[in-house]
Amino acid sequence: TTIKEINVALKDLKNKKIRSPGAVHAKWLESFGASAETMDSPEMNEMLNRNTLDGAIQGATGMKTYKSLALINQDYHLPLGVIPFLLLINEKTWSRQPDDVKAAMLKRGGEVSAIYGGKAYEEAGQQIQQELKAEGRVKTTTPSAAQLMTYEPRNQAVQQWWADKTPNGKTLMVEIQAQLKSLRSSS
């Protein structure tokens, strides 16, 4: 999502300052020649408001939550995934839970929670996109499947970079790819 005009090709990101939510997105932006600026959402809003940032990677729900939508006039809709959400419990607290609570958490947590949470997140994002379209103020561009395929070598390079720099990354990447394939084939 950006406040300044980006044409249909992401090559136009070259030499632009684009907010990144983290290292993986930054690496992807850098593959287009952008200057990736890693920052939190409130800082992103401040920089967008001052016109010192050319654009940002941020999901629709984050844009709404942090009241960033008023700061943009264009949305380049890319399926870049979402930042993982973890709900953690320390071992002492876990051990104090009754067995029925543990069973309920195990039954409704993990993959089940991820699937339902992901669906809810996607639906909320789609609703925000519909609201933006109805408002008519924000120009939305959604690249075609063919355009997305042209980005695939960059995506693969970033995935390889992550796997190389992450302890046990190559094994994790194989497991992630297998899980994604399984989830996608069952939906």
Regions found by a protein language model. Name each.
Residues T1-S187:
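N-terminal secretory/targeting leader peptides
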